[in-house]
Amino acid sequence: TNHIMEYYIYACYFEPQEEILMPELPIAEYYRTYADLCVKLQKYKRAEDAYKKALCWNPVDLDSYLGLAECYKYLNMMSRYLDVTKQAYRFCCTRATMARYYRNMGFYYLSSYNTDMAKACYTYSNIYYHTDNADSELNYIENALKEAKDKGVTKDDKEYDIRTMQAMFDKENVEPGPDSKTIGIVY
């Protein structure tokens, strides 16, 4: 680990039995930077390997988890995308990172044709931190549902309040807020 908060988060989640030694060089960051470059070059398998190595060096690095999830998205490995996104959740502790988590979950549900959950996730994402990305996904869903309604495939478009979205999340085992352990450590 390379940051003092990461040290405490690591100790909390991984409960090491031995002394934790931190490398003098940010090796995990080097691997993550290489992985980011591989993604830009569309070398997703290489990126996957590099993100995994980054996580070996720093198993609480949120950016490496999110990057690895993106690799799985591009490789169309949606179950791994979901698994890694859920692993990343533990380390989300800001409004922006929680919004990213819900955008990832929204993408997963959209790719699974669960438009209700996708819409709830993207809406929840915007509650945490408003982004153009979430807006464009919500517009895409709205337009697709409107077109389906016009063709008689669906009946109506739904609006969700927070309580309804949280009930939907409970049903699908999507966390409705940040992990309390992480928040306790960071704040």
Model-predicted regions and their roles:
Residues 59, 93-96, 129-130:
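Short coil turns that delineate tetratricopeptide repeat
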Residues 30, 64, 98-101, 134-136:
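TPR alpha-solenoid repeat register
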Residues 33, 67, 104, 137-140, ...:
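"A position-specific structural signal for the A-helix of alpha-solenoid helical repeats
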Residues 44, 78, 115-116:
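TPR-repeat structural position
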